[in-house]
Amino acid sequence: MARGLRPPLNGGGTRFLLYPQLPGLSNEVEPEIVFVSSPAGSVGVGPQDHRMYVVDPIGKERPYGFYPDGEGGIFHYRPPWDGPVVPPAAPGPGGHFDHLPFGTPQFEHAHAFGTVRFVLDIWESYFGHHVPWHFAEAYDRLEIVFLRGLDNAYAGFGSLEIGNYMQAPGIPVDFGLSFDIIAHEVGHLVIYSQIGLPDTDDLDGEYYGFHESAADLVSLVSLMHFESAFIGLLEESHGNLYSYNLLNRFGEVSDFEQIRLASNERKLYEFVDGWSKEHALSQPLTGAFFDIWVDIFHSKLWERGLISLHLEELSDRLEGDPGYHDVIQPLFDQAYRLAPEGFAQALAEARHHMGISLAVTWQRLSPFELDYEDVYKAYLETDALINGGRYRDMIVDNMEWRGIGKVKAGPRIKPPAADSHAFSPRTQTPPSQPQPHICSHGMPYRLRMARARGKVPA
């Protein structure tokens, strides 16, 4: 069952069965009962509630976005889908959705809805307030829409489109069953809401990398709210989070294939001459935050007397060394055997700290001229605000080891790829619509941008 959430989610909401890991990655993966905040009985056929709804169209041939109209102009193809649909998922007894059989479209519909709602609940808890959709002036609800054959998933203006593809003949990979991929897209929506949409595509390259990194971190922290993933991580790694395990995999589609790694050694120095894919550019920032999280976890273990100062310092010193695992893992194995519950408590505290500190940091950012150094400085400010600067040295060491605050990424050297998320026709605000975002600072987006440019007084 969901672990570590505020009380209304642990028994007072609507039940769903969610897979923390894409089925097929492991023979042992099982779905977990998760409660979301929508009161039992309030989620209707679809599923749908007041924030979102699911449709599985029949005959939808392309993603939403901007397309030529055949007469030299452009038209915006966007929600809602008003054509025929696959029969939707219906609630069972008590208004819950944990009764649907695996392997049916209706199970996938419920899984996608439950994932979006669960991740949104988690991050609204961390932010401490309602997270509105960035398209709220145009649409009341997010359309979670399936597009079979789309080899990706996209968060866009009013929609989250979910595809699938054939990994091999007769072996589909259904992204509606991938908690990680959907959670990543919800991460984009959270960032659009809390930071805002830029009003130009002439952006610092690091903005794109930041968006991918933030979405990965939303997914990573959310994953740790599954009890099976949380306990499984500890039982697999014995607290040595640099081990190769489920936490380090993002966008997985098989036991051996991953899109990105959280635990990586990439540095911003690699990109000073330019970059082509925001997924790659995101890795130094994601890696820095992952390393900070591990350092904080180790610090909490040491404070509880569960590991020695020698082990903590040795782990830091050997990080990246080829012999790291052979030296460090036996020491973690021994320490974990003595106090598994203490390790779990320390990891829960580190998870909570990361969620809160990321939420506070992101609210201090603006999309205008956003780069990694801005994120670095905002995170230091957050640490000073909520911890009295307790983790400053950890933050400085990990960020600057990655080159963050030392160098900047160069220009984009290739046009945006088809899978670019951060600023594309799928996410642009329609020209006829005002910018819908009202930022978390209580100031309309356009006024905030004008102030950032110095066109209005602060």
What positions do the PLM features span?
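Acidic/polar low-complexity interaction segments
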Residues: 1-117, 121-125, 133-137, 192, ...
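Zinc-dependent metallohydrolase catalytic domains
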Residues: 106-109, 113-159, 164-182, 191-457
